[in-house]
Amino acid sequence: MNRRRLLALLGLLPAAATALPVLQALDERSRPRRIRPAGGFHGDYFSNLPLRTQDGTPVRFYDDLLAGKTVAIHFFRTGCTDGLCPVVMQNLVQLQRLLGDRCGRDVFMYSFTLAPEEDTPERLRRFREQLGVGPGWAFLTGARRDLEVCRARLGFTEPDPRLDRDRAAHTNRVLFGNEPHQRWMASPALTRPEFLLDQINRVAGLQA
């Protein structure tokens, strides 16, 4: 199976729980997409838009979330009912457990909502508690126009406007970034947690 066909399957395959074994098999054979811009991604590119965490704490997109950090980022919505979001979230919970006390110290995890009108800080906090998320993983909301800029700057967009409007199309990937050293890599979110950890370590410069 060629890479183009694989990416198409990862983006478009129905996300019911019964499809999980197929998706996992595809993910294990996939190669992460390395992103290395010519001039680098810094504050003037990302912008410094205001957001809020699940606790209602105001933060700035670049200064507080990205600058000087190694990060793992994905987009979601708490009201997702297509079967994919809960599986992805549990996969990322397992990733956080593998990180242990590195999460919030060496690596910071961020989940940006795709539905800010629904996902208030209080709702995000309850959702986070239900997942059993530990420290170092922030759930973020804000004004839709600001979140759309964040989504575009982070590369969670599709060239086809019709597909880009499908919020489910943006929940099946995770972006790893090392802002100080300008290393960025994207992987399918249903890749085994151990493999995702390996990608974080590569981006962080802990292994070749």
Regions found by a protein language model. Name each.
Residues 5-25:
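N-terminal export signals
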Residues 20-48:
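N-proximal helix/coil linker or "cap" segments that precede and/or mark the start of modular domains
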